[in-house]
Amino acid sequence: MKILLFAAAFGLAAGYQAGSAPAGQAAPPASPAQPAPAPPATPTAQPTPSAAPLPDADPALWVVRDTDTTVYLFGTFHLLDGRPWFNDEVRTAFDASDELVLEAIIPENPASLAPLIQSYAIDRSGRKLPDRLSAGDRAALVRALAPLGAPANAFDSFKPWFVSLTLTVTAAQRLGISSNNGPETILSQAARARQMRIGELEGMEWQIRLFDSMTDEQQMEQLRETLRNLDRMPRTLAPMLAAWSEGDVNQLRRIVNASGGDSPAIHRLIYTNRNANWARWIRERMARPGTVFIAVGAAHLAGTDNVQSQLRRLGFRATRVPHVETAH
């Protein structure tokens, strides 16, 4: 279960697109004297023409209010299929807002992330990633690269966190789950269309640096977990997506809490510490009038140490917005 939560916890997944190295071209080792290798190309998720219409989703929404400030808290599913969700109380709240705030602003041109990837994702120590994997995990990496049309050495010079993220996102895309359908992308497009202010709680570089701050062993643990569970993604994804679509916060809470049991340190890094930071940001924003629509990964609004519980410690109460079905 951690494999998807690892990507789903970050807005980076919503804006991330892999590079465009030609399929079948080996990535050379990186060194300070030569350009960083490009990761294998990411396939674009394509809807199945004969697929049945996807069900309408009713994800959870919260609100924090005082006399002159309203802050909506919307939990997103960063990588999503084409099911409709931008309606009902979510659309009403967004339309009433004058500012959109994301974990990280989604760049209009995903290629703009390339310099950041080159700065942080390359292992310049000279170590080869396959040399650090067991024979079974090396074979799993080769199998994972095959659908991308990438050679076995495509990730030799990349850090484990980047390989984990890339494999998770591309595997999701092969299931028709894409950042193109994700709430961050759709909300950003809607905000730009009405010239709405867009802010961020962290930013792409901050999130990349957080990935990069994990210890080497933590990164390797995530990569091993990813390689050993990619084939289970359809079964892993289904309950998470169902809980999000139904606004079932209790089920999401069980999933998030279970994901943190094996590595409390990573759970604190990805969830607890960031949730506390965001609660403090909201406290400061409540001092100024206006209406703000905050969209962050749903896992941050579901775990036992979620943003709402952090807000309670600061004296603010987040209440669930009732679902009201409207014609659409």
Predicted features and spans:
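Intrinsically disordered, low-complexity proline-rich regions
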Residues: K2, Q34-P37, G315
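Structured, acidic catalytic/metal-binding patches in enzyme active sites
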Residues: P49, P53, D58-I270
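Short, well-ordered alpha-helical scaffold segments within catalytic/effector domains
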Residues: L4, N87, N275-A279
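Sec-dependent N-terminal signal peptides
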Residues: M1-A23
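N- or domain-start disorder-to-order transition segments that initiate the globular core
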Residues: G24-D68
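A cross-kingdom marker for long, charged
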Residues: P264-H328
